[in-house]
């Protein structure tokens, strides 16, 4: 085992955002008088400049005290040989965030509150307005010390004299964070970090990389040399089962729910049955002309809540970031290797690997959800604001969104095959 403070590879793009998003852009174009109709191009350029409009720029800044991400980490491992020459390995690892990235928008100021359910304090969230007359967004990069992760694993392994190696392992883990820093762009790291208060001090939630359960079974066979020592064969199969991927429950937004300038980054408030009756649903019409009345939308939302295990057990509160899990994922990979042993210890090896062999057997097997970031069962249709700045009360109206369940990734779920050749000496 051991303990220490660790820093991984630093994404310097987080720092370079401040150099590439300064609020000033220089662009040029070349217009030749030889182009038909451009004999008087000086006046044409002047007309464009005069008629043009200026959009407020966006800038990225880095707090002076910013430090590269660091974690305190401790691990302990034990290995024991059991009867039958079976190896048992136990390991635990714990990491505590010391410095991680956190993004905030300095152009925003709180001007009131928005109530997901009118009059229900538990559903209140800060309502923002752009306080800068010069900038659209001012994304500040600073640190947070919130966050931790741990993992406990156990593995059994047995090696047989005839060349078979068998291993099985199970890992239980938990990872929580404020911002996973999944984007290279400062603005994206801020706007896609789903939360109740999108510009607040930082809300802890499950990390996008959290995998509570993982099961792995591995079988490898390496044959002895045959055909007078010219050939040998290796075959491997690996099964991996994981408890799906994490995703957030959010609100789709036709109108900006909390005035932060971005639509779709607000976590869903899950109403109680009584609160649901107070929500302002309105009728909607889909692309085929089918009408959903307000009462039907309300009932459909209730049915969706009852069908989602997390929402059903967390009514009367905002959903946590990455609170939900996709279905359990099963994957089998195959490996076949054929070696030709030449003189002078030179070996030619031909390999065949089938990734996601499960899907090769049946197109409904081996599916994965890939990056299922969020689902939104309701749409914020319109925000009605009352009161003066500093004491604004905002209330939304909703429509129901029928496409509110994660779907498997078509590309990531497909099997693929790889052929290889190498010379070893």
Please state what every model-predicted region is.
Residues 62, 72-76, 150-154, 213-219, ...:
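Hydrophobic, lipid-facing positions within transmembrane beta-strands of outer-membrane proteins
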Residues 234-344, 371-406:
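Extracytoplasmic gating/loop element in the C-terminal half of outer-membrane beta-barrel translocons
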Residues 2-142, 316, 327, 397:
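Solvent-exposed loop/turn elements at secondary-structure boundaries
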Residues 165, 412-425:
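Outer-membrane beta-barrel "beta-signal"
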Residues 84-85, 163, 224-233, 341-350:
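Short loop/turn motifs that connect adjacent beta-strands in outer-membrane beta-barrel proteins
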Residues 91-229, 234-244:
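Gram-negative outer-membrane beta-barrel transporters
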Residues 1, 78, 90, 156, ...:
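Membrane-embedded beta-strand positions of outer-membrane beta-barrel proteins
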Residues 5, 80, 154, 158, ...:
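Residue-level signature of outer-membrane beta-barrel architecture
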